[in-house]
From Swiss-Prot:
Name this protein carries in UniProt: Polyamine aminopropyltransferase
GO biological process, one term: spermidine biosynthetic process
Temperature and activity: Optimum temperature is 90 degrees Celsius.
Substrates-to-products reaction catalysed: S-adenosyl 3-(methylsulfanyl)propylamine + putrescine = S-methyl-5'-thioadenosine + spermidine + H(+)
Occurrences of domain PABS (ranges): 16-251
One cellular-component annotation, GO: cytosol
Function: Catalyzes the irreversible transfer of a propylamine group from the amino donor S-adenosylmethioninamine (decarboxy-AdoMet) to putrescine (1,4-diaminobutane) to yield spermidine. It has lower affinity and lower activity towards 1,3-diaminopropane, cadaverine (1,5-diaminopentane), agmatine, norspermidine and spermidine (in vitro).
Keyword Cytoplasm found: yes
HAMAP family recorded: Spermidine_synth (MF_00198)
The organism's taxonomic lineage, starting at the top: Bacteria, Thermotogati, Thermotogota, Thermotogae, Thermotogales
């Protein structure tokens, strides 16, 4: 298969490449104009494409699935990171599995309490590409509190017991690369074991519209392991349906009853999406989502 760079070289004047992403079922999708192909490569695991769109800025895709765009990545990364970070009383040690673009790490490091944040990414080429081409999200890679580990996250987390305050799963789609390893009950159990007693957990769990099967499966498996499991939602404009799901879980901390909005109000770092009102509202689920999860 030819790379985007190779295809770009064959363009005639005033011609443009267009990026097509098909959602589950291949009947609906997203398309974006490519102003410029920045990088196109193939690792042992997946295809990596980075290109520029006139409205969205730099776009990062894995195996033909959009991971981030410069314009809207803050929505996803803030919701994935800050919900668990603000719920833990004093998060010092954090493990991020996946998230090789660096956006979740960037958000975690905004919390001054953090002493160490480990980013475990399975694909070293993603880290290299992010460091070079995704400056907006990879800005935390050289923070002295950050450690980058190239390893299979499902295997890496099993090395730890009672170790982390927060674990965040920033996985690729379960159908892309090795993302499916991060959706098993065995993996969630390993995360539970690696957390301290007051530890908290969050994971991206796909969209509840086109990917309802994976969404329900993730929720069911997480809830089998953690006594407290709650789904929350956020907007994500370039992800399927524009509605994205995350799942919070813990051994005892409740995401609403134990939430202190004053901590968020006093936070002195810039947040573009997450705030104390969004935190509470994100746990209010539409009826169709409740029904799919067996909550009504």
């Amino acid at each position: 298969m030819r790379t985007l760079k190779e295809l770009e070289r064959e363009l005639q004047p005033r011609q443009h490449l267009w990026y097509f992403e098909y959602y589950t079922g291949n009947n609906v999708g997203l398309f974006m104009k490519m102003n410029r192909v920045i990088y196109s490569g193939q690792s042992d695991i997946q295809r990596i494409d980075i290109f520029e769109n006139p409205d969205l800025g730099v776009v990062f895709a894995l195996d033909g699935i959009t991971m981030t765009t410069e314009k809207d990545e803050f929505m996803y990364h803030e919701m994935l990171a800050h919900v668990p970070m603000f719920l833990h009383p004093n998060p010092k040690k954090v493990l991020i599995i996946g998230g090789g673009d660096g956006g979740t790490l960037r958000e975690v490091l905004k919390h001054d309490s953090v002493e160490k944040a480990i980013l475990c990414e399975v694909d070293g080429l993603v880290i290299e590409a992010a460091r070079k081409y995704l400056k907006q999200t990879s800005c935390g890679f050289d923070d002295p509190r950050a450690e980058i580990v190239i390893a299979n996250g499902a295997e890496y987390v099993r090395k730890f017991k009672n170790e982390f305050d927060v674990i965040i799963i920033d996985s690729t789609d379960p159908t892309a690369g090795q993302g499916g390893h991060l959706f098993t009950e065995e993996f969630y159990q390993a995360c539970y074991d690696a957390l301290k007693e007051d530890g908290v957990f969050s994971a991206e769990t796909e969209d509840p519209f086109y990917d309802i099967g994976w969404f329900k499966l993730a929720y069911r498996r997480i809830s089998k392991v953690f006594p407290i499991t709650r789904v929350y939602l956020g907007f994500m404009t370039t992800y399927p349906s524009g509605m994205w799901s995350y799942t919070f879980a813990s051994k005892g901390i409740d995401p609403i009853k134990d939430f202190d909005p004053e901590k968020v109000r006093k936070f002195n770092k810039e947040l573009k999406y997450y705030n104390e009102e969004v935190h509470v509202a994100s746990f209010a689920l539409p009826n169709f989502v409740k029904k799919e999860l067996g909550l009504m």
